[in-house]
Regions:
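Nucleotide-activated chemistry modules centered on ATP-dependent adenylation/adenylyltransferase
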Residues: 1-33, 38-279
């Protein structure tokens, strides 16, 4: 059963950000994770609205670069990391990422290997991340190393995207009266444990794009190509080594053929497996 509020999702999201900054700013590290996608774009700019209200000048923004990122995604991330109110953390450290497909591992930024693209000049490349791990555990390791065990990270998950996210973000309180997150709590000494919050958990895809277009917010231009191939809800920007990226690979071949060749040569067996399963 659905219960509707008198507030719209935009007003509700702003209230959530106000709560986050009011309760935790200056008391624990607050960060925003971005992927280059539409949801993290909205998160970033909603945060800026509330930062302006509260007189907050900058916020740490983390991009955990998985190497096999589309050129247009990287172009957009460079724009984000140069915004005057962003404190940039662009991580390009080695780890082996698992993609749940029978031994398909990818040596992200593998030492001595020929990468899909060169690293950024000021990126963070010396973090020690457990090599064989899921992405969620890898980014947790990154956040712990950069911001400490009491970090509060803000992300862009939404319940519309999957039943699993619906269950995760509507059950189990992480703060009093708040279920739209994970982890949380305190240690025996009263200090904070790590916490991740998702303030746009109840937004629909149309809400996301309405906010972006209404406010004329720059976004990753890869979406413009995806709009011509897929329904709006199916347009996603993510690392190209994920299994679902098979739907995007033909488009990457068309718009960035040089990068596509480097990507396939980088991990040719991975993409052979993906293409075979897609057929």
């Amino acid at each position: 059963m659905k219960f509707y509020s008198e507030k719209n999702v935009y007003e509700a999201a702003l209230e959530r950000f106000r709560y986050i900054f009011r309760e935790f700013y200056g008391k624990r590290p607050i960060t925003i994770s971005v992927s280059g996608g539409k949801d993290s774009t909205v998160i970033l700019h909603l945060a800026k609205e509330v930062m302006d209200e509260m007189g907050i000048d900058k916020i740490p923004v983390l991009f955990f670069d998985q190497e096999a990122e589309a050129p247009m995604t990287i172009e957009y991330i460079r724009y984000v990391m140069n915004l005057p109110w962003v404190e940039p953390y662009w991580v390009q450290s080695f780890f082996r990422e698992w993609n749940a497909s029978k031994g398909d591992w990818f040596n992200v930024w593998g030492p001595g290997e020929k990468w899909c693209r060169e690293k950024e000049k000021d990126s963070i490349g010396d973090l020690v991340i457990k090599k064989n791990t899921f992405f969620s555990k890898a980014i947790d390791s990154v956040l712990l190393q950069l911001f400490g065990k009491d970090y509060l990270n803000i992300g862009g998950l939404r319940i519309e995207e999957s039943p699993a996210r619906l269950s995760t973000l509507t059950h189990n309180e992480v703060l009093p009266g708040i279920t739209w997150g994970k982890f949380g709590g305190t240690y025996k000494d009263g200090s904070y444990k790590k916490l991740v919050l998702y303030p746009i958990w109840d937004w629909k895809t149309n809400d996301v794009w309405y906010y972006i277009f209404k406010n004329k917010i720059p976004y990753c231009k890869l979406y413009n190509y995806l709009f011509t191939k897929k329904p709006l809800q199916g347009c996603r920007v993510s690392s190209l080594i994920h299994e679902e990226s098979i739907q995007v690979l033909p488009l990457i071949k068309e718009i960035s053929p040089g990068f596509y060749d480097r990507l396939v040569n980088r991990h040719i067996q991975k993409f052979r497996n993906l293409l075979f399963r897609n057929k």
